[in-house]
Amino acid sequence: MKTKSRYTTLAASLLVALPLGLGSVASAQAETMITAVMQAPLRSLDPVITTAYVIRNYGYMIYDTLLSVDADGNIQPQMLEKWEVSDDGKTYTFTLRDGLKWHDGGDVTSADCIASIDRWATQDKMGQIMKELTTATDRIDDKTFSMTFSTATNIALRALSKPSSLAAFIMPERVARTSPAEPITEAIGSGPFKFVMEEFKPGVNALFVKNDEYVPRSEPASGMAGARIVKVDKVRWVSMPDAMTGVNAIKNGEIDFIEQAPYDLLPLLESDSNIQLIVSTLQGGQPVMRLNHLQPPFDNKLVRQAALAAIDQGEIMQANIGDAKYFRTCAALFGCDTRYGTDAGAGDLVKADAAKSKALLKEAGYDGTPVVIMHPTDFANAGGSFVPVIAQELRQGGFTVRVDAMDWQTLVTRRASQKPIAEGGWNIFTTYLSLADISDPLANYAAASNGTGAWFGWPEQARVEELRQNFATTDDDARLTALATEVQELVMDNVGVVPLGEFAVVGAARASLKGILDAPVPVFWNIEKTGK
């Protein structure tokens, strides 16, 4: 077994990472194929309509973005040749680079970019702030467009370059004109891979082939930026819901890659010289519990605060991960050891206080109505391994609890429902947020508090939205820190989201996959497969 890691414990810092990207500069042999088991099966083809990471990963296979972030955190052009900023800091002019082609042969144009940004910005929480600040978006010519804002801001660069959900993927204009409420079904991008629709079996199999017409950038690959050079002919994603089946398959050479290896089975992989383990904190993240603010009983703030008081992060993380070197408790909404990491307002977040939970429920007049928790049994890190612990902690805190078991895709669909429980609604769901998605009040979509326009759960706090917009229009470090701290205090008081700790992902790959890219997303460009 070969292990690649920049640290031995999470205490070294969850901000430093060696992500699970795959890369190499060697040439691929004919008809090479990587067979991969991703964190969850691919069922949807719309990376704008949901924050589910497997669909984000799919997006990076076939689409491209205007901007990217390199391994040092710097914003770099990707589809762009350049951008320019007006003297007053309000207008950004973007120019596309040469050689951008859709998979069906057409040229990528500024009209495609404008339509794609518009659809994405209605869904993405940072995009929503950007849209509120935008006064004009103008097509200048087929390769050039501009965005003008009501005040000086760098939110366009930040929003269009952010690597994780929702990434601002550029689509053909005809596709991007689809209502955000209607999932797209086409799979035509301009990225380094093409999607083979004829092979697609939702939840079972997805096939990508090298896009021979793709023109990569000339700069070396770095993080999500630089050249996206495909060195294999095909990548196939397959579903293996049983963890032991996946481990046996990679040991036997039947598959090449597991995005998230099961922690309890790592000893079986560590002892195999044909397997490399890749420890990633940037692709790991923060498990969260999300409460439905629209439906009883969590439409009552006291009941939400009771739920927070009942939670014990240590018990939950132990159930989820097990090995303490891969997790830690953390009371920071924006991540521990990050620029805006703080425990301000966290109160009872880390340790349970069942007596306080019961007292709050009594004060709220809670009548014992069952709280319905959705349990994604096929996705450990999103709750499959720890929802039973949450249920027990809530019961100890005085709640009546009903656990509804389901697969991850069913949860992703059901969590969009704002209906009462009797009509298929819900009270609690769990998932995890990548550290790339939680670093500040703009990136952290769970902090958004614009009611029914917010992420699933729909908290509403006008002051939080005011602070988030202020965060987008200042560059004073002290002011930014003060804004982030106040956002955390307000969100935690309102129980907009309940962070449950932090963990590192451990991925597994055959030793024949050479080269590792530092990236917050598992990528398949720049990879060399040298054998079985």
Predicted regions and their residues:
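Long beta-strand-rich cores associated with HINT superfamily self-processing modules
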Residues: F200, G507-K532
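Extracytoplasmic/peripheral linker and loop segments enriched in polar/acidic and small residues
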Residues: D348-V350, R402-T413, S417, L442-A511, ...
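Gly/Pro-rich hinge or "lid" segments in bacterial periplasmic/extracellular proteins
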Residues: S164-R236, M244-T245, A355, A359
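Surface-exposed binding/hinge segments that line
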Residues: Q29, T95, I129-K201
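N-terminal lobe/hinge region of extracytoplasmic solute-binding protein
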Residues: V37-D87, A115-D118, I188, P499
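Ligand/substrate-recognition segments at binding pockets and active sites
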Residues: P202-V204, A243, A261, F327, ...
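Structural transition elements
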Residues: F193, A324-E363, D378-F386
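Periplasmic-binding protein-like
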Residues: L294, F298-T338, A382-F386, V491-P499
